[in-house]
């Protein structure tokens, strides 16, 4: 997936879930953060981030990437669906794809033929293990439980798009969200599939470099 033109900046402070301060072109600017996770190891004072200039909206800039020790990391969670869709259009054979499908009071990312897909964006890596979530997510837990509930009608598929390359495996973050962890392992125990996409991030693009089932 191609990225928009990016500019380097220094992260200063996160004001709330959606806005942070960055030092850019000699002054402090407010920048949009499209990610509700904590991102505490990435959005910290003094770290290098890369922003794009937006058209319209309240804030002129949006934080897209942050630098980790061994990898650039994309923190724009909405990109995960685009990355996944680009990947499947190149590698899967299917007849019909629907986006944003509402079922059982939940909205799922894709219905691909008879496969009901929920995609999660992953940014956190600890000791070589990619982990989700990095903040409690009732919505994410609800998605998994509804996937299980609907498994008599659809084939469930849970997808984690890890928007960095410096990891070897994936696990749910049980310490941060025990309820999500419980739902995840219930889903896995029933033999349903979990797909992980590893991405290599550069200043120009994000590429899927490895795909595996957990």
From Swiss-Prot:
One GO molecular-function entry: DNA binding
Cysteines joined through disulfide linkages: none
Domain of life where this protein originates: Bacteria
Pfam annotation, one family: SfsA
Signal peptide range in chain numbering: none
Family from the record: Belongs to the SfsA family.
Name of the protein in question: Sugar fermentation stimulation protein homolog
